[in-house]
Amino acid sequence: MVKSHIGSWILVLFVAMWSDVGLCKKRPKPGGGWNTGGSRYPGQGSPGGNRYPPQGGGGWGQPHGGGWGQPHGGGWGQPHGGGWGQPHGGGGWGQGGSHSQWNKPSKPKTNMKHVAGAAAAGAVVGGLGGYMLGSAMSRPLIHFGNDYEDRYYRENMYRYPNQVYYRPVDQYSNQNNFVHDCVNITVKQHTVTTTTKGENFTETDIKIMERVVEQMCITQYQRESQAYYQRGASVILFSPPPVILLISFLIFLIVG
């Protein structure tokens, strides 16, 4: 009778510990759907404009002191005005400006959990603040609601990216935030890289590119979420407390 009561209490303790570890595991919250219609970001400018504006400036390719491919005014990939990674103007990616090496900020500590996730999902891109580059995808088949844009996309889809930049899903509270960030950095990087090669993008290009990249970012989020949960389940299953309790309980049953 005593052994029976002890066995019951051990079983209860085992279940409680297992549940506690599972509840304490940090998981990203599922977000709302993306194809619910309407603007994702109210307060946008021109009709049919961009849904993913960069912070602190005009829309993609807008005439803020210099349009696409212009030599002055801070356009994308330009030699003056503080463009991306440019030697003039300061503020570019990876530029030190007037700061000396003595004032360099300390390097951020590497999160080993993120490194493990990156090894399974994609390579970390240097100089992009921890963003990873996903594997190549087939460009999605999208209907834009009018014949002109549908035809334009079919004829120019090769000009749009087939990989996306993203951060680990556990850094975001929901899918919407992940996709928004993913679209912004992917469109920006692709635009800068392509513009420096001498190819310009029209407003139609940017609009279509955002839609295409949005679908790819949603797919990337789904892949990363599934992989994240699988890694989390493995950690919970083989973490020390549940394993020790399970072994102890089995030994008690065998001996008893």
Swiss-Prot record:
| Chief localization | membrane
Say yes or no: keyword Lipoprotein present.
Answer: yes
| UniProt cross-references to SUPFAM superfamilies, sorted A to Z | Prion-like
Keyword annotations: Amyloid, Cell membrane, Copper, Disulfide bond, Glycoprotein, Golgi apparatus, GPI-anchor, Lipoprotein, Membrane, Metal-binding, Prion, Repeat, Signal, Zinc
What are the start and end residues of every segment in region (5 X 8 AA tandem repeats of P-H-G-G-G-W-G-Q)? 54-95
Detail which positions bind Cu(2+) 1.
64-66
Q: Where is this region: Interaction with GRB2, ERI3 and SYN1?
A: 25-233
Where is this chain glycosylated?
A: 184, 200
Sites binding Cu(2+) 4 sit at 88, 90-91
**Database matches in InterPro entries:** Prion (IPR000817), Prion/Doppel_b-ribbon_dom_sf (IPR036924), Prion/Doppel_prot_b-ribbon_dom (IPR022416), Prion_copper_b_octapeptide (IPR020949), Prion_N (IPR025860)
| Residues engaged in binding Cu(2+) 2 | 72-74
Q: Which residues form the signal peptide?
A: 1-24
Q: Which PROSITE patterns match?
A: PRION_1, PRION_2
Repeat positions for sequence: 54-62, 63-70, 71-78, 79-86, 87-95
From the UniProt record, list the residues forming the propeptide. 234-256
Q: Where is the lipid attached (GPI-anchor amidated alanine)?
A: 233
Q: Where is this region: Disordered?
A: 28-110
What GO molecular functions are on record for this protein? copper ion binding
State which disorder the record connects to this protein.
Answer: Polymorphism at position 142 may be related to the alleles of scrapie incubation-control (SIC) gene in this species.
Q: Name the family.
A: Belongs to the prion family.
Entry remark concerning the domains of this protein: The normal, monomeric form has a mainly alpha-helical structure. The disease-associated, protease-resistant form forms amyloid fibrils containing a cross-beta spine, formed by a steric zipper of superposed beta-strands. Disease mutations may favor intermolecular contacts via short beta strands, and may thereby trigger oligomerization. Contains an N-terminal region composed of octamer repeats. At low copper concentrations, the sidechains of His residues from three or four repeats contribute to the binding of a single copper ion. Alternatively, a copper ion can be bound by interaction with the sidechain and backbone amide nitrogen of a single His residue. The observed copper binding stoichiometry suggests that two repeat regions cooperate to stabilize the binding of a single copper ion. At higher copper concentrations, each octamer can bind one copper ion by interactions with the His sidechain and Gly backbone atoms.
Q: How does it assemble?
A: Monomer and homodimer. Has a tendency to aggregate into amyloid fibrils containing a cross-beta spine, formed by a steric zipper of superposed beta-strands. Soluble oligomers may represent an intermediate stage on the path to fibril formation. Copper binding may promote oligomerization. Interacts with GRB2, APP, ERI3/PRNPIP and SYN1. Mislocalized cytosolically exposed PrP interacts with MGRN1; this interaction alters MGRN1 subcellular location and causes lysosomal enlargement. Interacts with KIAA1191.
**Protein's recorded name:** Major prion protein
Organism whose genome encodes this protein: Capra hircus
Question: What's the name of its gene?
Answer: PRNP
